Amino acid sequence: MIADNSGKYKQLREAYPCFEYKGFEYGIVDGDFEMVFHFFCGEHSFNPKHIFKSKDFYSFTDLNKEQLDLLVFNVGMIELISYWKAFCSKKIRICNYSLDSQQQDFWRKIYFHGLGEFFFVNGIQTDINSFVEFEFEKTEILKPCRFDLEDRYIVPIGGGKDSVVSLDLLYGAGRDVRTFIINPRGATLDCCSNANISRDEILEDRRTIDAHLLELNAQGFLNGHTPFSAMLAFTSLLVAAFSKRKHIALSNESSANESTVKGEKINHQYSKSLEFENDFRSYVSKYISPDFNYFSFLRPLTELHIAKLFSKLKYQYVFKSCNAGSKQDIWCGNCPKCLFAFIILSPFLEKEVLKQVFGKNLFEDENLRTYLLQLCGVGEQKPFECVGTIEEVNIAIAMRIRRNPASEKEALLYEWLNQPFAKQYLAQTDTDFCFTPQKDHNLLPRDYEIFSKAYSVIKKAELRRMLSAEKIAILGFGREGKSSLNLLKDIMPKQNLIVADGNKEIISQNQVSENSFQDIEFRFLEAGNFDEVTLFLKTPGIPCSAIGFVPKEKLTSQSDLFLRLFANQVVAISGTKGKSTTSSLLYKII
């Protein structure tokens, strides 16, 4: 719904000509790190707060004042836009520090494009050069700092499908990953729990919006969408500094670059776009620190590709990305975001699974017809939601119908089939381009390589979670024992492992050698030597008679683990002739 608030916009700019960023405070309160910002506009004042919860694995006291001032000030610069938009003042006065001309251009661009939807739905006509100007009370410009960061990762979790795909792929590839959540809720915590991540292991920011802003919204002051992902970007720098982690891996896909309104540079997802990501990386490197590596891990992928990967994970019943139902932690089933999620997953999940996840078959709900047409590109704009491209939506629907022709009788799919473009998409059977990683991204080469082996990495993530809580002993150090050790060190590089063998010469050689196994504890295979072990990984060279002391429930093997992971994908081939030929043929077919 487009409102005509252009008159109100002009009146408020005249009545409230200057918005002030007075300053900020921060400190440790009851063990947590708190920061409060002070904004003023006329008779109105706002004091939004962030509380970073104390955790055992990091410290708030390792950063000096210069580092904290720099990071906190910049969080305030993005926080203020949520309050400025109520008045749209002509000037923003920054009282404690100054910005050079390039910094001003950076912030003006974020504010203008990040508020593109806000201006559009309020019927406000303005341009990037005239909508706001900066003024300063002081001349000091904060200098960039160096930070002592390690080669480890942070993955922000939003509760939807994208962030858990990033989490599992990076985790399965052996990366040291911590999750980060702003204002934890059911879905975000459930996704972490499903990944065997406890609440104590999560980086948390409790962000509080000043209640007076909500009062102004109710009174009719200007209101609308703000660039939350830009807030996440600047806040993530703080938790990265606190936890000494260099890499901040967002989960914004290539589809986020598409404009929401045809013919206009208005993008609901601007702060998820590659343009914003590149601008942010440049700004951080020059004005904050070159030590941070902020990037979107899923940037090379389409929504369809992500949905396909997600369908192979075990988060279907805990993920939720419905904004309308977020407070109740549900899929509302009545909004464009729910319909898009249903559509994009429909080629990859069975109908009964989708009904269990969303509470109903959304393709049968005629009340969603308008949203369907908007998502498919019928009309001047897509819904103002984080949804995929028009092309992806149409390809997903066509894939669903080809996979299940009977579904064409469902109300929304019947409607889609009557659109003039439907035949084109149904005839387009070559969709490989939707599942080919793109080259325009900021990933490190080692992280980009993960997509070439995504399925095996997903299975490695499952295996890692299956074994991460165990104290493991590998029984036997022949060929299979060494391959087991290499696999476990690949997926769990910091796990303490034990290798046991009945050959004392093998044990003694490895106990004294300075080789790649120097982090492994080697022991002689005998009873009473493994009281702390919870899982024994047996190899073929160790006879059962030699390990009678091992309880059966604690015993496993490579074959056992393989079948636990791949039982649904295993085809057994036997016979005296043609096994290798048949195997090769089946491999090519399936």
What is the predicted role of each segment?
Residues I2-F37, H44, K286, P290, ...:
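ATP/NTP-dependent adenylation/nucleotidyl-transfer catalytic domains that generate, transfer
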Residues K55-N64, N183-Y317:
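ATP-dependent adenylate-handling ligase core
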Residues G172-V177, D490-N496:
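Conserved S-adenosyl-L-methionine
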Residues P184-G186, R479, N503-I506:
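Helix N-cap at the beta1-alpha1 junction of Rossmann-like dinucleotide-binding domains, i.e.
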Residues Q495-Q511:
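NAD(P)-binding Rossmann-fold cofactor-contacting core
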